[in-house]
């Protein structure tokens, strides 16, 4: 299993719109997301992702077998999703 560590760029962290964009992109990938030493959760579950309480500037770890999905999701989190049209 591979991992990617990402600093959250969205001003509101992974709440509301950024969480929806992220979890939609993560659907079907099998990727998990964790904040700090917390237990990883399914990255496609908006409720579980929002429950992590990830804020702007926090570091999260993505894990999974699909390298391409990990890269895409890491790039997504590294952008300010609040600023996306």
Where is each model-derived feature located?
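C-terminal structural segments of small proteins and small subunits
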Residues: 51-85
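Compact, glycine-rich, soluble single-domain proteins
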Residues: 7-47, 51-54, 64
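Intrinsic-disorder/low-complexity, polar/charged segments enriched in Ser/Thr/Lys/Arg/Asp/Glu/Gln
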Residues: 1-5, 59
């Amino acid at each position: 299993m591979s991992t990617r560590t990402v600093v959250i760029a969205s001003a509101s962290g992974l709440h509301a719109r950024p969480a929806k964009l992220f979890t939609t992109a993560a659907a079907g990938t099998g990727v998990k997301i964790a904040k700090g030493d917390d237990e990883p959760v399914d990255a496609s579950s908006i409720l579980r992702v929002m429950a992590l309480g990830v804020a702007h500037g926090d570091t999260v770890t993505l894990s999974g077998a699909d390298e391409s999905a990990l890269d895409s999701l890491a790039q997504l989190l590294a952008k300010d999703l609040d600023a996306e049209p």
